[in-house]
């Protein structure tokens, strides 16, 4: 009497299928664990480097986003696609703001340059008020943010009279500095041409009130990035910085910038 053996073959086939399924699960878990470990390491490294670059405490909170793609797959090519970092309460001299940093094409080789680096610092109206000494040569009654301008107001003494004056000041970026230039002036409710006011009989007083001054932002930031533009947007002063050929292993991230003397 013969005995058929199909059942053991099915069991062996089923065993191979189970083994392959287990192997796939193990590989997936390994990738997930490896990906998580890689992201944790990269996030910590980025945090530490930026804390040093911006002069922050070692435990200063940051939101680091390494993008949606597999970090391990990107690392295999030698370049990370993109990194976005948000940092609150970054000191910029007299100012404090929120910095949003964007970098693309970040090489794993620290001797190679990053593709692009762009940072945006957002400073609210309360902090802008700390720039009073750079906006005018007299004590100011108020500092507010207007339609693309920083609006200042003061009361000045002229011929034994107290005269209310105000000015709309336009901030611009120049050689790593915030430069403040008056666009319009109102004296006792009347709009006066800036040139006429400074060249008139009250010229010396007007010049003191309107004197264009500058605030060096570069000295508080890594020399790798430069102040590119500035604008007043709603209730914030927005500073945009950009960096070209930034080498992660070079001194440009550990040294501060400078402004013309």
Residue positions per predicted region:
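A structural signal for short hydrophobic beta-strand segments in well-ordered beta-sheet cores
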Residues: 143, 169-171, 229-230
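Hydrophobic residues embedded in beta-strands of well-ordered beta-sheets
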Residues: 150, 176-178, 237
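Secondary-structure transition/turn motif
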Residues: 155-158, 182-191, 240-250
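Short helix-loop boundary/capping segments
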Residues: 167-201
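Extracytoplasmic/luminal low-complexity segments enriched in Pro/Gly and acidic/polar residues
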Residues: 197-261
């Amino acid at each position: 009497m013969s005995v058929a053996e199909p059942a053991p073959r099915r069991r062996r086939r089923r065993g191979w299928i189970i083994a392959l399924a287990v192997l796939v699960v193990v590989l997936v878990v390994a990738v997930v664990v490896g990906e998580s470990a890689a992201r944790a390491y990269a996030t910590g490294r980025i945090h530490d480097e930026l804390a040093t670059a911006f002069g922050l405490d070692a435990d200063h909170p940051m939101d680091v986003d390494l993008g949606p793609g597999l970090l391990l797959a990107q690392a295999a090519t030698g370049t990370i696609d993109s990194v976005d970092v948000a940092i609150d309460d970054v000191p910029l001299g007299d100012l404090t703001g929120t910095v949003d940093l964007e970098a693309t094409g970040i090489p794993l080789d620290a001797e190679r340059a990053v593709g692009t680096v762009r940072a945006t610092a957002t400073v609210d109206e309360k902090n802008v008020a700390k720039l009073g000494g750079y906006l005018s040569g007299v004590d100011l009654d108020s500092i507010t943010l207007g339609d693309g301008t920083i609006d200042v107001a003061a009361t000045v003494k002229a011929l034994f009279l107290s005269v209310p004056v105000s000015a709309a000041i336009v901030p611009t970026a120049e050689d790593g500095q915030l430069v403040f230039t008056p666009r319009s002036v109102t004296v006792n409710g009347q709009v006066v041409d800036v040139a006429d006011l400074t060249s008139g009989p009250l010229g010396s007083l007007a010049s003191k009130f309107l004197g264009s001054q500058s605030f060096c932002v570069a000295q508080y930031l890594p020399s790798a990035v430069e102040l590119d533009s500035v604008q007043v947007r709603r209730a914030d002063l927005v500073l945009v910085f950009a960096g070209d050929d930034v080498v992660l292993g070079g001194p440009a991230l550990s040294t501060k910038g400078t402004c013309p003397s």
